[in-house]
Amino acid sequence: LTCFNCPEVYCNRFHTCRNGEKICFKRFNERKLLGKRYTRGCAATCPVAKPREIVECCSTDRCNH
């Protein structure tokens, strides 16, 4: 599995996940409309969203754009 791993809106940097990491995720704060920063990467399970945070998970290559 390969997942994107950069904070910009338009991300083109990705890496190969380690064994056991079968999910790509993208998380961001729903309140920051301008200057939105993302956290992207690989995970074994989908991370839990904090208050006012959105977490999207998927399981195909480079799906966390």
Curated annotation (Swiss-Prot):
Protein name per the record: Weak toxin CM-13b
Molecular-function GO terms, alphabetical: toxin activity
Disulfide bonds, paired cysteine numbers: C3-C24, C6-C11, C17-C42, C46-C57, C58-C63
Keyword Phosphoprotein: no
Pfam family, one: Toxin_cobra-type
Listed InterPro entries: Snake_3FTx, Snake_toxin-like_sf, Snake_toxin_con_site, Toxin_cobra-type
The organism's place on the tree of life at top rank: Eukaryota
Protein's organism: Naja annulifera (Banded Egyptian cobra)
Chief place where the protein resides: secreted
UniProt record similarity statement: Belongs to the three-finger toxin family. Ancestral subfamily. Orphan group II sub-subfamily.
Ranges in coiled-coil conformation: none
Localization per Swiss-Prot or TrEMBL: Secreted
Keyword Disulfide bond (UniProt): yes
Tissues/organs with expression: Expressed by the venom gland.
